[in-house]
């Protein structure tokens, strides 16, 4: 495979820097000096003492080598004790340590400044005017609201996705039913009705926003309970916004998961079903023992991606009073009257949640020997599962 243009020159230059002794010393000392110059020692405290000492020691060693180089000139490699062949490899390894110390010094300055900023914001009695100071102040003083919102968001996403998975298993069985001429009229009618219901359910749910679905579910539940003669206090105890949000996420995700499972099942080789039937298994036994397990495995990446989608899409349920992360954010805004800082905090928290759960799902997919979940989108792509299955 040919190297890109310029790669050979860069490789030779890197080999020259690594092998030529004076450049290892002087180049690394320049990096150490830059790190010391950009990092005031007073702001680091005891934490920056060791990296600073290492950088100063390397600079001193490089100055000694420079003095020998100027004094000995052509005899430098032969007479200088630092330039002995046996010391070149240890010095190169020590230069890596100096680079690490220089990087630590460069990072300590901003980190120390941010820590000082956080301490000042937390100790403040009023909301600071600066953006970062105000965000830290609001995050610290509203931490109970944010913790409650994050907990509710995770509960809705986890339980809603699990419930939707089992509902999707039932609906996908109805969805893939096709009437057979050899069956009696009652069985054919039941299959047609079941498949039609699954198609209609998928069309309606996937064609309407979750925000509208949440409002319909919540107020429909209130109307049913009020029609049954329940009092308002009893209704609020039984039909809270949390339960309405959980039902909404479960019903919404069921439609998407059903299509994902259908794609995974249709990606299974039809010959396996025929082979199972030829061995004496009934249609239900062949589907349950042969086709369904493979279809579910093909669909795991897209199904796990639905959990990430639910973490983000649950934010729309705040309109019915679900105390999720978005509701907590609006509550903090109502207290401090600063929207930009609060919404930036919510964005960072959502990003952390999605990254953590994506990493966990990727590790789970590796243990199950399936493809990792793809890029996180706003909706689950039903075609993802069969496409991956055909590629494998």
Residue ranges and their predicted role:
Residues 2-392:
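Transmembrane alpha-helices and adjacent helix-loop boundaries
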